[in-house]
Amino acid sequence: WSSDVCSSDLFYYLCGKQPLLPRYAFGNWWSRYHRYTEEEYKELVERFEDEKLPFSVAVVDMDWHIVDDVDPKYGSGWTGYTWNKNFFPDPKGFMSWLHEHNMKITLNVHPADGIRAYEELYPRVAEKMGIDPESEIAVQFDPADPHFMEVYLKDLHHPLEEEGVDFWWLDWQQGTVTKVPGLDPLWMLNHYHYLDSSWKGNRPLTFSRYAGVGSHRYPVGFSGDSVISWESLQFQPYFTNTASNVGYGWWSHDIGGHMMGIRDDELMARWVEYGVFSPINRLHSTDNPFNGKEPWKFDKITQGVMEDYLRLRHGMVPYLYTMNHRAN
């Protein structure tokens, strides 16, 4: 690294630059691991609008798809690609409504279990993979197979994107092994999903975990799941800053903390103050009535701080996007 050029420039020269993010990614993100219904989510968005709290991204966690109603013969509902019509009776209409309210949509997926016979898109995917749909043989997840990846993206994800999904939250947690020694499935997911996400002509984006050096080319990064504690808040700025040593800048943390811990209004206020000045400001929590991140659930001082800072972040979007463009 002995050069007049700084080491980060040399790193990017060797490994590629961080790409330009779409403008909406710089706004506030709403995320919660909670079994929302379509009506509940709409009521939440309308409450945000009534309170003049601007959000640009609607994250819908894994319960958008069928989870508990999966026949045990197919396995668990951890992986899924079929809307739960009990919660979202009109998925296309729901996503169209969010778009009308100036929000982009990302859905959480855990791809490891492949495509099982109960999925709405199974017949189409099975036929493309040379499997008789009547056999109900699962289409195995195989990121090392180019044909599978083509079908996986074009025949499984594209139909959902045509309905309104803007990008995907790839919540991979199943290790680093594929049939090809040394080939990390998360790396393949990040690479192919990111490149494919521009197929409709939009600026590409994915939302996923870190797969090693070089992952900066596939933003945005998901650093969760964080514990609700002062120690977690203390660590996140350090984590974000030192990630620049490997060229990684676009981190999305669980602002406010995801799980465990105790309710602490001051902690929440300080965390949002940090989140607004972190790369991505995504409020997040687990499905617990005591750690939801709606500002009106906190005391008046904390509520005021959260609301002021969320509005501040939204006001910074033109500046952040302009600087991102110049840096790129």
Each predicted region: which residue ranges?
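Catalytic-domain carbohydrate-binding cleft regions of carbohydrate-active enzymes
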Residues: 3-328
